[in-house]
Amino acid sequence: MTLWLGPGPLVLASQSRARQALLSNAGIPFDAIPADIDERGIAKASGLSAPGEIAALLAQEKAAFVSNHHPGRLVLGADQTLALGARGFNKPADRNEAAKQLRELAGRRHELHAAIALVRNGVTLFADVSIARMTMRPLNDEEIAAYLDLAGDKATSSVGGYQVEGLGVHLFDGIHGDHFTILGLPLLPLLGFLRSQKLLAF
């Protein structure tokens, strides 16, 4: 029996290993084709400030970009933003910026906004934004330095300077939200839509 009933593999407009692993583990065949867009430029030009709205816009833009180059294919775009109060964060450019972000987040609760958009032939068929709330434990400079030493390049590959599926889990006191949302791909609403479109066997 085949789970996926689509005419061809889904297209994932992302190079995120976490997102690719989530789709693979769920049995969804896909081709990973990252979108070549200027995320910061698009977000700035939009005038949007709400993290969830920015994530939704970027997920849509990624999917639309790849859809324009692959007509007829079902394209999944995804994006995730981090907000501490009203302030949004970007991926740290280097270790120093990662340390700065961790100092700001330590001992406080922040939100992760994960957005997805499904697009075919430039038309958005489905979109969703999910939120997870993350409470980082208090950290001193020595603990932050130790974490960054161990995390290496992974500290600059994710917003906030951490990957909660790895060593980043040691930074937290509390996590409230969907596991898939935290990893940047709200899988349950995605699967629900695919089922509604008769693209899954069950």
From Swiss-Prot:
EC number of this enzyme = 3.6.1.9
EC class, as a word, reads: hydrolase
List the keywords (alphabetical): Cytoplasm, Hydrolase, Nucleotide metabolism
Q: Which reaction does it catalyse?
A: a ribonucleoside 5'-triphosphate + H2O = a ribonucleoside 5'-phosphate + diphosphate + H(+); a 2'-deoxyribonucleoside 5'-triphosphate + H2O = a 2'-deoxyribonucleoside 5'-phosphate + diphosphate + H(+)
What is the purpose of this protein? Nucleoside triphosphate pyrophosphatase. May have a dual role in cell division arrest and in preventing the incorporation of modified nucleotides into cellular nucleic acids.
Among PANTHER family, the record links this protein to: BIFUNCTIONAL DTTP/UTP PYROPHOSPHATASE/METHYLTRANSFERASE PROTEIN-RELATED (PTHR43213), BIFUNCTIONAL DTTP_UTP PYROPHOSPHATASE_METHYLTRANSFERASE PROTEIN-RELATED (PTHR43213:SF5)
Can you say what this protein is called?
Nucleoside triphosphate pyrophosphatase
The organism is: Rhodopseudomonas palustris (strain HaA2)
